[in-house]
């Protein structure tokens, strides 16, 4: 199932809002996909629309140890092992099914936590410091 241009733009706008709210994040194209980086270096989210004809609107995110296998097995209609980065534990999150955006925000934050340095995690955990 491919998403309409309006659906893709709406989903990307929500992902941008979530990802760019995290400390020192940037967005740029990487491998032709909107991607989000910590300090413009480490990728923590890739946004894909119909990657190589897979028919999915999805995020690929860095996932905590064990999460990829658990979610891809328990909820294959929503989560999957993405190509190229799946062997490193990354998780595919479908955005073309019933999406819980609060859950997506938590997943994006978890991904950020996988790649961000401790100084930025401290900003995230203790913003008043």
Identify the residue ranges that each predicted region occupies.
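Charge-dense, helix-prone N-terminal extensions
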Residues: 1-129
């Amino acid at each position: 199932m491919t998403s309409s241009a309006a659906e893709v733009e709406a989903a990307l706008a929500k992902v941008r809002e979530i990802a760019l709210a995290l400390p020192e994040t940037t967005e740029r194209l990487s491998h032709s996909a909107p991607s989000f980086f910590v300090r413009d270096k480490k990728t923590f989210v890739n946004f894909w629309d119909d990657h190589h004809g897979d028919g999915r609107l999805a995020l690929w995110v860095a996932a905590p140890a064990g999460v990829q296998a658990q979610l891809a097995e328990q909820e294959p209609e929503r989560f999957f092992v993405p190509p190229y980065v799946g062997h490193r534990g990354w998780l595919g999150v479908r955005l073309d099914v019933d999406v819980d955006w609060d859950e997506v925000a938590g997943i994006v934050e978890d991904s950020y936590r996988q790649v961000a340095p401790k100084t930025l995690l401290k900003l995230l955990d203790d913003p008043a410091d």
